[in-house]
UniProtKB/Swiss-Prot annotation:
It is found in: Cell inner membrane. Belongs to the PlsY family. GO terms for biological process: phospholipid biosynthetic process. HAMAP family: PlsY. The chain crosses the membrane at residues 5-25, 55-75, 88-108, 118-138, 164-184. One of its GO terms (cellular component) is plasma membrane. The lineage of its organism: Bacteria, Pseudomonadati, Myxococcota, Myxococcia, Myxococcales. This is Glycerol-3-phosphate acyltransferase. It comes from the Bacteria. Its EC number is 2.3.1.275. It is a multi-pass membrane protein. It holds the Pfam family G3P_acyltransf.
Amino acid sequence: MSPDLLGALLVAAGYLAGSIPFGVVLGRLVLGVDVRTVGSGNIGATNVARAGGKKMGVLVLVLDAAKAIVPILVARRVLAGTPHAEVWVTAVAVAAFVGHLFPVWLGFKGGKGVATGLGIFAVLAPWAALAGLVGYAVAYGLTRISSVGSLTGTTLCAAGGFATYGPRHPISWAGLAIALLIFLRHRENIRRLVRGEEKKV
């Protein structure tokens, strides 16, 4: 099998892995509810925490990050030493992220991508991920508003990716695209923030 065909298959697998809606699955199996019908209606960790407590929220956060981490690590191992390996690995990361946002299992209606994006940065740019976590903690600690923490952390992750790899590397641009998509998925949160109506968690 050619490296490019293998890379394409790994991208498809990354998308399918990213599409696994852990928030919905655990909500139904453990909490007995469809998290899409409670709170904000989002399938991510914050809304799961609203429905089932902080431990459930943390579990979903870890699993949503892992569904990007695992495909990236597999792609790195399988494609090691092949031409364009870094490009394909980056493509697998983006595919997992897109899978979370537009999961085939849920009619392409998914989450906002913060945890999955964090998983991507944790593997591809660990220092950027650390900066993002610190930024989230500080912003959330000051405001008690999850979206403020998420958007602050996302911005620092993307900036950290550029600082790590420079403007010519595919990971830098993938990180920027991921950040922009996260901001787009938070557009309603941003509107509520502007109006002073965003709820604290």
